[in-house]
């Protein structure tokens, strides 16, 4: 499977523990393409349809013509076997906003 950074896939995030986002849902790939080529895992941020405009850990987007949020506070590594079909891709502008948000939250 050829997975690219900023592609959006459906992924099966079950089983989950506690407050982890679960179910089959869209996820955005945030790991570097070189990692995606050679590893059997990818780093993702799950998407949710529950919109929290005041949460600084979330980025609002449109995905498959629906409002969604990228849950940067729920970054995790998953097996590529959890990925289903590719459904969308972040725009360059949203990818830049996502990189900035990740840096602001976890950087330096």
What are these model-predicted stretches?
Residues 1-108:
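Conserved functional hotspots at enzyme active or ligand-binding sites that engage polyanionic ligands
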């Amino acid at each position: 499977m050829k997975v690219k950074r900023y592609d959006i896939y459906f992924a099966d995030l079950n089983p989950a523990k506690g407050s982890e986002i679960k179910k089959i849902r869209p996820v955005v790939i945030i790991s570097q393409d070189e990692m995606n080529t050679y590893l059997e895992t990818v780093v993702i941020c799950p998407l949710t349809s529950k919109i929290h405009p005041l949460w600084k850990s979330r980025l609002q987007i449109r995905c498959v013509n629906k409002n969604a949020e990228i849950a940067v506070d729920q970054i995790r590594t998953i097996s590529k076997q959890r990925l289903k079909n590719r459904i969308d891709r972040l725009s360059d502008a949203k990818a830049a906003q996502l990189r900035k948000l990740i840096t602001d939250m976890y950087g330096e």
